[in-house]
Amino acid sequence: MIYPPVNTEYYTPEGEKEEIYLCLSRLVKYKKVDLAVEAFNRIGKKLVVIGGGEQLDYLKSIAKPNIIFLGRQPDEVVREYYRKCKAFIFPGEEDFGITPVEAQACGTPVIAYGKGGATETVIDGITGVFFKEQTEESLIDAVDRFEKISIDSGVCRENAEKFGIERFEHQMKNYVEYCCQHKTVHQNEIDIENF
């Protein structure tokens, strides 16, 4: 499997962690940001939400004062929050999910729904914590478990480097060379001769 690359030279650890959690996403229903908002409404911890989308007004309407919405932000602001948040919240199910890897590249652990791509990018108990169901209770339990363990930001960073640009380029080059040498036609029936 060749994973999409993450710019680990841009997303780097820096500064001190603060008592905030971060959720970065397009604010659309399937991303499940409402789950994070409802869970953090109940536990009262500070949650910063970055992103825009059709659910922004709805999410603001249900959020308590401990939840702050910043809307869409440039990469510099995103990186700043990745660096200073205590953990990154990833409540949706994605095929891959770049944001958990960007967070880890900044030395930040991830609290993620334990399905889909997160299971390939986050190491439960090592670089983050999984929750088993997309329910408030399950996410609250994961935050509680996270608060009771110590996660090494250096290990998060090392894990993210497995998804860096250099590795991606190396894997793609090897794959293309292999296909050319073996004149292999794969899933999409690409004509290697005319590729």
Q: PLM features: what roles do these ranges have?
A:
Residues 2, 6, 10-50:
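Conserved donor-binding/catalytic core segment of Leloir-type glycosyltransferases
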Residues 57-79:
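Nucleotide-activated donor-binding/catalytic signature segment of Leloir-type glycosyltransferases, i.e.
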Residues 79, 101-105, 119-120, 126:
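Short alpha-helical segment that forms part of, or immediately flanks, the ligand-binding pocket
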Residues 80-85, 172:
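Short alpha-helical donor nucleotide-sugar binding micro-motif in glycosyltransferases
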Residues 83-95, 108:
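Acidic donor-binding loop of glycosyltransferase active sites
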Residues 89, 109-113, 122:
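Short hydrophobic beta-strand element within catalytic cores of glycosyltransferases
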Residues 134, 150-195:
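A charged, aromatic-enriched C-terminal amphipathic alpha-helix characteristic of glycosyltransferases
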